[in-house]
Amino acid sequence: MPILDKADVPREELSPGTDRWALVDGDKGAESLSVGDVSLAPGAKVPIHIHPTEEAMVILEGELEAVLGDETVTVTAGQTILAPPGVRHGFVNRSSGSARVMAIFPTARMERTLVD
């Protein structure tokens, strides 16, 4: 049973102030799962994008403005967003504190297309 440590995972900058760690994916032995830990500094964003698969986003810390399709809402720690395949979504951290999101995909290779 593999035990994976975030300290061993390289940080990927998604956009200024937004970092992602690929905790689980095909490179780490997963066959049909990807899990990413995303950190957003105050004012940072995850640009609007789509995926060919669904995505569950668990808000771990902080408060974010979330876009899902044509809707914009405020989400906080403990809430989960489910984005269906092909539906545009993204986040902006409009708070004065940092925020974290756990992004979960039903595929070993997460694919993302920026849309706006």
Task: Annotate each PLM feature.
Residues 48, 66-67, 83, 89-95:
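Short beta-strand His + acidic residue motifs that chelate non-heme Fe in jelly-roll/DSBH
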Residues 44, 52-53, 71, 87-88, ...:
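A generic "binding-loop/recognition-motif" signal
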Residues 38, 82, 97-112:
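A short hydrophobic beta-strand segment most commonly corresponding to one strand
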Residues 36-51, 85:
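Conserved short histidine dyad/triad with adjacent acidic residue
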Residues 70-85:
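Short acidic-glycine-tyrosine-enriched beta hairpin
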